[in-house]
Amino acid sequence: MKVILSVALLGLSASTIFAQTTDEPAPIRVDVDIVNVLCTVADKHGGLVTDLGKDDFEIREDGRQQAIRYFTQETDLPLTVAMLVDVSGSVREVLAEEREAAGRFFDTVLRPSDHALLLGFSSTLVLWQDFTASSERLKKALGQLHAIPFRGLPAIGQSMPGTLLYDAAYQTAKGKLARVPGRKAMLIVSDGLDNGSQEHLDDAIEAVQATNTIVYGVCYDQKFSGCSFLKNLAEPTGGRMFEAGKKRTIEEIFQIIEQELRSQYSIGFAPINAAHDGKFRKLQVKVHTPGLRVSVRRGYYAPRP
């Protein structure tokens, strides 16, 4: 019998919500004095540029140029994907399309060394499938995803059930991705509205950045202005927000995300500022070829003493 873990986000630590499973990618020890930065490069038409070398890049931390120690193109190295799907009542009409597109995404993007997990969120965070390399398990879990029905307005003195977008991103980063090595991406499929999260936007961004995870938002907002919530969460991590609708279907967006994940550059450097002070360090990556755009996280937090 399939067991589904459903937990309330409010008042629970990540260690309470999530337990490590045997299928989870094993943690590894890393040299904390080497900072690894993932980025993608696009031309003025949005086409991905995949033929650049180490000497084409320049990286700065807090304005100071850093010496690039390691450089690779991350086409085949292991990837971990956390997919978070909004299952609040407002998504009922698009949930079937989401299931099909996400299933094809897992079929296409996952390779034997990759892992993914699936979570649903509304006023609670539900772990539908923990870390697995099996797209079949993920598709089976997708088939069980269902929207939480709207049960009417709350009684006087009670609060309206919320869509805890920021809490979901925060808890997933802290509870599932923090101990996972290598490349990581968080895909959030939602109408983008956050209503009732305990964590603020800055808290969610900090948690995600601390795990070196890129966030991609897929927004299907039809009536509200919720897409800006996803955009504000994704861009500081080096990711993007896509609007699903007449111009692009959810499946087309997943295809773009897949291409970006397989077209990343990895740049490693030893910071000139070696202080373990826990402070935020701003990052800037440039390429020497005019007209190219680099997508990269805006910074990272130095280790603490």
Regions found by a protein language model. Give the residues of each.
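Scaffold/interface architecture of coatomer-like assemblies
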Residues: 18-305
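Bacterial N-terminal signal peptides
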Residues: 2-16
